[in-house]
C-alpha cells in the first residue's frame, strides 16, 4: 500500500533522526532493521531481547509518531528480537516466498495461515471452503465469495489461501489486492495512459484474491474493468476468491452482471464468534505471543468483547501493555481496570446523526446527498431505513426526527410503516437492519 517497506522504514528513520540526539539514535535505534510489512503492521527486528525492550520502553512512541507522519495514517509497529521464534517464522516465510517456484505478486501477512486460524461454528463453512480452494485451485469452488462483518477473519482466510497455494502449487502466480487498491491503480493507469499494463497485471495470473469488493459499488469504470478481468480469469480456468462485508445481492449499486457472476460459485458467510470460539481465539493469541494469561481473564474478555476478533486481540494487547507499564501481574482486577474504557464505551450515545452516518457508510452514499432532496431509489430507500432506525433506537419525537432529515413527521411515519412491513417479508432487508443496528450500537 505504501510501496516497498524498506523505503518506508528509511523515511521513518529520517523523521526519527530529527527528533533524537545522534547519541540516542546511534546507541539504540541504528540497530533496527525492517523485516516485513503486512496488513498495516510494520515488523521490525533487533539483534537481541535487551535492545528490543529498551526500544519498546523508551522509543516506541517516537517510532509510532514518525510512522504516522510518513504514511499519513496509523500503522501498527511490531518489534521482534532475532532470538525469538516469531522472528524466525517470519524470516523463513519470507525466504520461502522468495525462493518458491510460484510467484507471489503481493505481500501477505506471514501470521495469516490456516494453522493460526481458529475454527468454530461461526466460520467452519468459510474455513472448509477456503481450504478446499487452496488444495485444488479452480477445481473446488470458483468463484468463492466470503462475506461477514469487520474483523471476523475474512482477510486472514484469503491470506491463508495465498500462503498455501504458494507453498504447495509450483508455478502459480498469486495476486492479493483490496478493491480500493484495484480502483486506485485503475485510476492511475488511466491518468498515465497505462491501461494495457494494468490489464496485463491482473489478467495474467492464476489466483486472484480480492478483498472488500463492496468498495467498487457506485464506481462504474471500476466495475466495468473488474467485469472483464473476472471474465478473462474465469474463462481461463483461474481461481477467483472475493470477500465482502455482505452477500452479493445486498451490495447496493452493484451491476447485475457482476452480482450474478459472484453467485456462480459458493457463497460462505462468517458470523461473529460464539463464546467458546472467542475463548479459543484468545488462548491461541496468548500462546503465539508466549503469554501466560489466567483462564479467568480470558473468560472475562471473551464475555465482554463479543463483536469481532480484531477487538478481542486488541483487548488482550491492551491488558498486557497495562501490566507491563505498571509492572503488575495479570489478574482479573487488573484486566477490569485496563478494559474499563472499552467495556463502558460499548453503550455509546445513539443520535440521528450517528444513524445517518452509519447508514451512509453501509450503503456507500454521500452524507450530503442523503440529506438533500434527491429522490433516486439508491438514496431515498436508505433514507427511509435511517428514519426507521431513528424511530427504533432513539426517544426523539416524530417531528424532531423529521427535522433531522429536513422532512415533516408524516414522511417519518410513512417510512417507518413501510420498512416495518417489508422486514416481515424480506429476509435480506431484515439482515441489513440487524447489521446496521449492531454498527450503530458499536458492536
Curated annotation (Swiss-Prot):
Keyword Cytoplasm listed? The answer is yes
Q: Where in the cell is it found?
A: Cytoplasm
Region annotated Domain I, interacts with DnaA modulators, chain positions: 1-73
Job description of the protein: Plays an essential role in the initiation and regulation of chromosomal replication. ATP-DnaA binds to the origin of replication (oriC) to initiate formation of the DNA replication initiation complex once per cell cycle. Binds the DnaA box (a 9 base pair repeat at the origin) and separates the double-stranded (ds)DNA. Forms a right-handed helical filament on oriC DNA; dsDNA binds to the exterior of the filament while single-stranded (ss)DNA is stabiized in the filament's interior.
Per the record, the domain comment is: Domain I is involved in oligomerization and binding regulators, domain II is flexibile and of varying length in different bacteria, domain III forms the AAA+ region, while domain IV binds dsDNA.
Q: Where is this region: Domain II?
A: 73-106
What's the encoding gene here? dnaA
A matching Pfam family: Bac_DnaA
Q: Does the keyword Protease apply?
A: no
Q: Note down the stretches annotated as region Domain IV, binds dsDNA.
A: 324-443
The Gene Ontology biological process annotation of the record reads: DNA replication initiation; regulation of DNA replication
* Molecular function GO terms recorded: ATP binding; ATP hydrolysis activity; DNA replication origin binding; lipid binding
Q: What is this protein called?
A: Chromosomal replication initiator protein DnaA
Q: Where is this region: Domain III, AAA+ region?
A: 107-323
SUPFAM superfamilies in the record, alphabetically? P-loop containing nucleoside triphosphate hydrolases (SSF52540), TrpR-like (SSF48295)
Hey, which family's this protein in?
Belongs to the DnaA family.
The record's section on InterPro entries has:
AAA+_ATPase, Chromosome_initiator_DnaA, Chromosome_initiator_DnaA-like, Chromosome_initiator_DnaA_CS, DnaA_C, DnaA_dom, DnaA_N_dom, DnaA_N_sf
Amino acid at each position: 500500500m505504501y510501496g516497498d517497506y524498506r523505503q518506508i522504514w528509511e523515511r521513518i528513520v529520517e523523521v526519527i533522526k530529527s527528533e533524537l540526539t545522534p547519541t540516542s539514535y546511534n546507541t539504540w535505534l541504528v540497530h533496527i532493521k525492517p523485516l516485513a510489512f503486512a496488513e498495516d503492521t510494520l515488523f521490525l527486528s533487533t539483534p537481541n531481547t535487551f535492545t528490543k525492550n529498551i526500544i519498546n520502553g523508551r522509543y516506541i512512541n517516537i517510532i509510532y509518531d514518525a510512522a504516522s507522519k510518513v504514511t499519513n495514517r496509523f500503522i501498527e509497529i511490531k518489534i521482534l528480537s532475532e532470538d525469538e521464534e516469531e522472528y524466525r517464522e517470519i524470516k523463513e516465510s519470507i525466504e520461502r516466498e522468495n525462493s518458491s517456484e510460484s510467484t507471489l505478486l503481493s505481500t501477505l501477512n506471514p501470521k495469516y495461515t490456516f494453522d493460526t486460524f481458529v475454527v468454530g461454528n461461526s466460520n467452519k463453512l468459510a474455513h472448509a471452503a477456503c481450504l478446499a480452494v487452496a488444495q485444488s485451485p479452480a477445481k473446488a469452488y470458483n468463484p468463492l465469495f466470503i462475506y461477514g462483518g469487520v474483523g471476523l477473519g475474512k482477510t486472514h482466510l484469503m491470506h491463508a489461501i495465498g500462503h498455501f497455494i504458494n507453498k504447495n502449487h509450483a508455478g502459480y502466480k498469486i495476486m492479493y489486492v483490496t478493491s480500493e487498491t484495484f480502483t486506485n491503480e485503475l485510476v492511475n493507469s488511466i491518468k498515465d495512459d497505462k491501461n494495457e499494463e494494468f490489464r496485463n497485471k491482473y489478467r495474467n495470473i492464476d489466483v486472484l484474491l480480492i478483498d472488500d469488493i463492496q468498495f467498487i459499488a457506485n464506481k462504474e469504470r471500476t466495475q466495468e474493468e473488474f467485469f472483464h478481468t473476472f471474465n478473462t480469469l474465469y474463462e481461463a480456468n483461474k481461481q477467483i476468491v472475493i470477500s465482502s462485508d455482505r452477500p452479493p445481492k445486498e451490495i447496493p449499486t452493484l451491476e447485475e452482471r457482476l452480482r450474478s457472476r459472484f453467485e456462480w460459485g459458493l457463497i460462505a458467510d462468517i458470523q461473529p464468534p460464539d463464546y467458546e470460539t472467542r475463548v479459543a481465539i484468545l488462548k491461541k493469541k496468548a500462546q503465539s505471543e508466549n503469554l501466560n494469561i489466567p483462564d479467568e481473564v480470558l473468560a472475562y474478555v471473551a464475555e465482554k468483547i463479543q463483536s469481532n476478533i480484531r477487538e478481542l486481540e486488541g483487548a488482550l494487547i491492551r491488558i498486557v501493555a497495562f501490566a507491563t507499564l505498571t509492572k503488575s501481574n495479570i489478574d482479573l482486577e487488573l484486566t477490569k481496570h485496563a478494559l474499563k474504557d472499552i467495556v463502558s464505551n460499548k453503550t455509546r450515545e445513539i443520535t440521528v446523526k450517528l444513524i445517518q452516518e452509519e447508514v451512509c457508510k453501509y450503503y456507500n452514499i454521500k452524507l450530503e446527498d442523503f440529506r438533500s432532496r434527491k429522490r433516486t431509489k439508491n438514496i431515498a430507500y436508505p433514507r427511509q431505513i435511517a428514519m426507521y432506525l431513528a424511530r427504533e433506537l432513539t426517544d426523539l419525537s416524530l417531528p424532531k426526527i423529521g427535522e433531522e432529515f429536513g422532512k415533516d413527521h408524516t414522511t417519518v411515519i410513512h417510512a417507518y410503516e413501510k420498512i416495518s412491513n417489508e422486514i416481515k417479508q424480506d429476509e435480506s432487508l431484515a439482515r441489513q437492519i440487524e447489521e446496521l443496528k449492531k454498527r450503530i450500537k458499536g458492536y
